[in-house]
Amino acid sequence: MKQTLILAFLALASVAQAQIRQERNLDKWQFSRDGKDWQQVDVPHDWAITGPFDRKWDIQHLAIEQDGQTEAIDHTGRSGALPWIGKGEYRTTFRLSAGTKHTTLYFDGAMSEPVVYVNGREAGRWMYGYNAFRLDISPYVKSGVNEVRVLLNNQEESSRWYPGAGLYRPVTLITAGDARIDPWATIFKTVNLAGSKAQVYVETQATTPKGKGATRVAIKLLDANGRAVAQKNLAVNAQGMVAAQLNIANAKAWSPEQPYLYTLEVSLYQGNKLADRLRQRVGIRTVAVSKEHGFQLNGQSRKFKGVCLHHDLGPLGAAVNKAAIIRQIRLMKDMGVDAIRTSHNMPSQMQMQVCDSMGMMVMAESFDAWKEPKVKNGYNLFYDQWWRKDLENLIRGHRNHPSIVLWSIGNEIPEQWNKEGAQRAKDMTDYCHQLDNTRPVTCGGDNPKANT
């Protein structure tokens, strides 16, 4: 009888533990180009970087209008002559305990057009290979072993540079209870910064099932040594929303010269029981732009000493690699650079985390094209249905990074010359400001006389 009680207690403890948020990096996968021959790979993984080189992967037949071309001709040398074009498939398994209530798959990027299957059923898909996306796979999973398959398709003439191919950014499995916090609905922003005094605003959204006791949220801001410099306890309202303003007496501002980071800790309680906890690295800093003072960081006017940085890592390929990203940022800082533009696409979380910690300002860019194409099978195929979804994921997923000081909605857009382009620019700018009212929005144009 005593042994039975002990076993029952351990089982309940295991279930209770499973309710708290857990994140697991899914890094061991099998990969195949044809669905027949499989190899073991580590994700992040770029299937094309190992070659072989061949001119056929690189031919694009078009007229580059920016270069004054009026007739289509063959172009080569744009996308690396590596075998990134075509289809590929990844598969892996993971195990869930019986107490798991909510399960999410987070893809930080998958090149390209990923379709995700869980236990043989389609769980979701995305189009843009540079964007992060989340899938609630709770309806498709079971206790025990579960299988995930990801199908990818890189169309020919879909990129003006080497995009890489495959699950080139991390894939994360997130499990949580039925009471949980939404990381993408958690907002941290600096309201006021005057000397060493700061006011910050924190907002979060919680899912709180009824009938399980009163729910509250504890918000803490921790310094680099883990000490709480501000905290509040608040009841969750009927919509699951919590908002608070915190005062920090001896605030340390984030800047490229002193990239000081705090930790935002948000804890959700049902009664006295911890139901979920979220931690994010954040920085206290202000951004402003005006015709009188130009760009200002923390109230000080400064000019960007910036570079355009594509996402690939040279001979390492497109698969994100923290050591290689740190090396890139260190080299640029050594040469006097204090800002990067994520040319010409959405960045990885890993890259932004490095920029946060090392002190590199960022213009986070979105698209190389809108509805009018630069290449035959570019983002123009998806623009109408997907631009709002893509901007939403970019901004909700990255808006708490202190390094990001500007959003960019495009690069050298072909329709910059017409009224349709001007309207699209306005629509996207308004939507960016709706999601984040703390940062300016820009677009990388190539002619000052354009309508946009």
Protein language model regions, located:
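Accessory beta-strand-rich segments of carbohydrate-active enzymes
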Residues: E23, W29-S32, G80-P183, P209, ...
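Solvent-exposed serine/threonine-rich low-complexity stretches and specific carbohydrate-binding patches
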Residues: A123-G124, Y128, A228-G240
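Substrate-binding/catalytic cleft of secreted carbohydrate-active enzymes
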Residues: I329-R330, A339-T452
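Surface beta-strand/loop "capping" patches
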Residues: D178-K210
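Beta-strand-rich binding/interaction modules
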Residues: V116-V118, K197-A235, A244
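Accessory carbohydrate-binding/adhesion or oligomerization-edge regions at the termini
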Residues: A18-E71, E147-N153, L173, A224
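N-terminal carbohydrate-binding accessory modules
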Residues: A185-F188, E265-M332, Q353
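Hydrophobic h-region of N-terminal signal peptides that target proteins for export
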Residues: F9-Q17
